[in-house]
Amino acid sequence: MKKVLVVLTNTLTYGAINRPTGLWLGEATEFVAEMAKANIPVDYISPKGGFVPLDPRGMKYVTDPIMSVYKQPDFIRRALTSSLKPSQVDPNDYQAIYYAGGHGVMWDFPNNTELQTIAARIYQGGGYITSVCHGVAGLLNIRDAQGHYLIAGKNITGFTTAEEILAGKKSSVPFLNQVEVEKRGGHFVKKRAYKEFVIQDGQLITGQNPFSAKAVAKQLIQAIGK
């Protein structure tokens, strides 16, 4: 069985603002826990490879199921300390790519051309591009075979402008995902703030916020099984 590639951030701070950020842990662990239940193997990649920092704000929402994955030596090693570099990955090995969030991704996901190429090749091979919350930033600049934005004309979701305001981070991030999706012709679909929501449009599956990671995983598993 082909694997699923989980994309994580290397970003430690909010740009020049010396405040810690990184991966929102539950967005990775809840997703990979569902993959494990379905016997779907995963690999972990980051823009630079290696160390993946954790967003301390996300640790306030850690549950027992999140901890059960976090404590696994395999997860600590392959996801948090020795994630793969893009150059170490063959897109042909994967049936889907999943962009986990955390505010850190706003700095190192959107303009990473290596990750864009990997995602585009998975998509062109019939695979799925998926994301949750801020992870949608990784989809913004992926192009299709004709050079158009992949998200143009597609129904997708991600962390909303309202949620960014409620989080108190609107002035700390370099852009707003909802605005950038719409600039590129994407149809940004949203529900109530901080409520689970996932939407699929063909080979794109996206979740709105941290509480949607499990739903994204389940939707992907269902799509793969068809």
Where are these regions (language model features)?
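Extended, subdomain-level signal for the structured scaffold at the beginning of enzyme domains
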Residues: 1-125, 137-226
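Active-site cofactor/cluster-binding pocket
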Residues: 128
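Catalytic nucleophile serine of serine hydrolases
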Residues: 133-135
